[in-house]
């Protein structure tokens, strides 16, 4: 059942240092591609792009 969930939990990882900082949910019907957001990375101490990891 969890594999076909419409709003699965995803993990966002920093593009620069690869640290997994955020967990969020996304709607798989509206956003089938990988999600990318600009968020604050505490390790880099700056706003960087965070991409969805699998």
Curated annotation (Swiss-Prot):
The protein's matches in Gene3D superfamilies, at most eight in alphabetical order, are given as: Ribosomal protein L33
According to the record, the residues making up region (Disordered) are: 28-54
**Would the keyword Protease be found if you checked this record's keyword annotation?**
no
Q: What does the record list as GO biological process?
A: translation
Give a yes or no for keyword Ribonucleoprotein in this entry.
yes
Q: Where is the composition biased (Basic and acidic residues)?
A: 30-39
* Keyword terms, alphabetized: Ribonucleoprotein, Ribosomal protein
Q: A GO molecular-function term, please?
A: structural constituent of ribosome
Q: Which SUPFAM superfamilies match?
A: Zn-binding ribosomal proteins (SSF57829)
Give the GO cellular component terms, alphabetically.
cytoplasm; ribonucleoprotein complex; ribosome
The family annotation for this protein states: Belongs to the bacterial ribosomal protein bL33 family.
Q: What is this protein called?
A: Large ribosomal subunit protein bL33B
Q: What is the lineage of its organism?
A: Bacteria, Bacillati, Actinomycetota, Actinomycetes, Kitasatosporales
């Amino acid at each position: 059942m969890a594999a076909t969930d419409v709003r699965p939990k995803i993990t966002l990882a920093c593009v620069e240092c690869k640290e997994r900082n955020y967990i969020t949910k996304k709607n798989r019907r509206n956003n089938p591609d990988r999600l990318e957001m600009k968020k604050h990375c505490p390790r880099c101490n700056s706003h960087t792009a965070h991409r969805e990891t699998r």
